[in-house]
Amino acid sequence: MLETLTVVVPAFNERDSLERHLPRWLAWCASHEALLIVVDDGSSDGVEELLAAHLTDRRLRVFRHRGNRGYGDAIKTGIYRTETPYVATMDADGQHAIEDIELLKEAMLREGADLVVGARPANQPGGGYRRLGKAVIRRLASLLFSMKIRDLNSGMKIYRTELVKQLLPFCPGSMAFSDVVTLAHLNLRCVVGEVPIQVVPREAGKSTINTMTAVDTVLEIINVMMWFRPLKIFLPLSGLLMVLGTAWAVPFLAAGRGLSSIALLLILTGLMCAMLGLIAEQMAAGRRIDLPEVATTELKSSG
């Protein structure tokens, strides 16, 4: 039987969770023509030994990083080694239900999507700072990318393998991977869908997400914006500086005191930002990739 889907699970010190859920994941893969790739990101709690004990199952492939390289790099390792037309990702902490991947795949086939995101409930468990961080990231992405994805950093997604492999070089190896890979699809005008999924509380292990994760994600979003659409950052900044400079200059000019040095500095800095933005846009245009053939379909007569 030819498999069409591979599920990639990055794991770092998630032995207890994998021990609980791995048999169920493998059973699901067996009944849905799917393969499972688990990437051990340098775990030190016995994940390697646990996974080795399950390698008799032909549907399981295991890759191990010698050191902890990061969530995004673990996902990249799995996707680069995927050979099926579709690849899904989910977290190793057991909060995702592997059964929801079928919903994402159905939506992808139905809508002809290039990426489908599993949207978690808005009232999911989490601290106030964590929810605030997600809201800030979502708002920033909305302003810079004109996007309307509700759960930008969900770990459960399904991709067209050929397309996502071409976007991986633009994505970071950190926790920001989930946000950036979605934004990369949106920036290239790919068809991105979203399907509600359920999450359950973590039963074992401890989350590694913290405040610095949100800071890193914001910086990576700005970095992606600079790579793809730098004018969206430089032009607003330029306009703001020039407006401030003009507003500062008007009272001095009206009083006959000439042009203020501060006003001149603000206006010149604004002009420099505009010029830098144009140069950056030209550089971005030179390295911008074209949509691959997988994102293009040909309409044929039904007769």
Task: Outline where the language-model segments fall.
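Hydrophobic helical membrane-anchoring modules
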Residues: M1-L2, A176-G303
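Acceptor/aglycone-binding surface of glycosyltransferases and processive sugar-polymer synthases
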Residues: F63-R81, Y86, I98-M175, V200-T217
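A conserved acidic beta->alpha catalytic loop
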Residues: D40-E49, G94
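Short, well-formed alpha-helical segments that are part of the catalytic scaffolds
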Residues: E14-W28
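Donor nucleotide-sugar binding loop of glycosyltransferases
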Residues: E14-S17, S43, Y71
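Short beta-strand/loop segment that forms part of the nucleotide-sugar
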Residues: H32-S43, F63-H65
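Cell-envelope/extracellular polymer assembly enzymes that use nucleotide-activated donors
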Residues: T4-T6, L35, V180
